Amino acid sequence: MFKLKDATMIYDMDKEDKVYAMREINLTLPDKGLIGIIGPSGSGKSTLMYTMSTLKNLTSGEIYYNDILLGKLSDAKRQELRRKEFGFVFQRHYLVPYMSALENVMLAADGSRKSCEEKAKKLLLDIGLKQKEIGKKPGKLSGGQRQRVAIARAMMNDPKVLFADEPTASLDHDNAYLVMDRMKEYAKERLVIVITHDVSIIKNADVMVEIWDGDIAKITDRRDESFGGTK
């Protein structure tokens, strides 16, 4: 579970006109489900993801993950937390150019090569790649295909939290919906946090958090169980 208390991020602290990427955000997220963080460019939604995942530090306020105060962790402990608990899908794919799609996914693998290869193939097929594309290198794949490889790689080690920043940006609508359906299924036992400006692709989210100008404008909860979020 994540809990944010007065979480604030300010850029250009040394300037007279400071930029508030996040303004005293208070938010509680559960330990599983599909969460959509929605807002226009510059609204602060990506900054929210980066601070929750320990990739950036807050200016003030607190973020807890399973009762651990993230701001108190050393750099080494943060790296360990990201490696063991978190998975990431970024807007840039960061695939190894001389490795095949399958090999790129297996980079994140723990376990025997045979079992990991079978799992990696299944993930790639489930996310929409064709059998003939699995052995291709990134340079031979389209932007959308590379994006799906990155998503499969992020899922490879079954992270407890999957952070996805605009994961369908390179996909057409049909493939975007396929990927989001897969993420919805994946979120039954894990927490999946999707950052997007496109409300249509996150319509099946359990919870939608709308961010405007660094603040929470609205929270929509489609689940029966309790969920907390306050400004």
Language model: regions and residue ranges:
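Conserved ABC transporter NBD signature motif
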Residues: G61-L69
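Conserved ABC ATPase signature
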Residues: K137-L141, Q145-Q147
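Helix-to-loop junction immediately C-terminal to a conserved catalytic motif
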Residues: S53
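Conserved ABC ATPase "signature" region
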Residues: L69, S115-K132
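Conserved catalytic motifs of ABC-family nucleotide-binding domains
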Residues: D158
